[in-house]
Amino acid sequence: MRLAIPAYRGYNRAAMRTDYFQQVLNRLQAVMESQQQAMEQAAEWLADALTADHLIWIFGASHAGILTEELVYRAGGLAPVSPIFIPGLTCDVRPITLTSTLERLDGYAAAAIREVPIQPGDVLIVHSVSGRNAAPVEVALYGKERGARVIALTSLDYSQSVHPRSRTGKRLFEVADLVIDNGAPRGDAVVHLPGFAQPVSPVSTILGAAILHAIVAEACAILLERGIQPPVFLSANLEGGDEHNARLMSRYRGRVLYL
């Protein structure tokens, strides 16, 4: 049953669409300027790991895990990116609210990842917009315990406005080795409609994907400067893509979790 509200006929509908695009563009520009140093450091860390034949790991819970999928087995992306998918923390579970329950549950993520073979010299990227729940904090702490460099991709505006829900008493940005602020607002959504109190249309996925792909591009440039061929996937829908990718995957089989 839909909820009836008084009709509001003052909308410029196209302006709402334009507003979202403008919000994204403005925030991308702001991130590009304000996070330049952090992204450069992240690119150096990725390049260092790949130079030494180490892996890049990535984790996010629920919708934050979309960026895990975005970096893994991706045309134009790095082959040695190993995903951390924790049961119950991906968007294919039913009921979907289970993701929120388990992300907040102290000890759940820590128990789920204790056999993940992160090694010293690896890089671990943990994505959480609010950064307040137990799961991303526990994954980040595990990565540090294992000797990896831990990068937090989060919203400082959002995270600093909320209390931690982890028994550690910490938020993600407080436990990572490097913090990249994605520029998303508190609550993530950015379009405000007249007559409707709740903002709509989140931005963190777009901002986060742009940040990570930009870091990968710079890391590949660093590898080339060092005389190292970047291990990058070709689209499987281009001629020769399957063969190219098979060679890359054989190199990392047994180390990258999805292989």
Language-model segment annotations:
Residues A15-D19, T51, I56:
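N-terminal glycine-rich anion-binding loops that anchor highly charged ligand groups
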Residues S34-T51, A112:
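A short, well-structured juxtamembrane/interface segment
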Residues A38, A42, G76-A79, A221-L259:
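Active-site phosphate/pyrophosphate-binding segments
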Residues W57-V216:
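Glycine-rich phosphate-binding loops that contact phosphosugars or nucleotide phosphates
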Residues Y11-N12:
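Short, positively charged and aromatic/hydrophobic N-terminal segments
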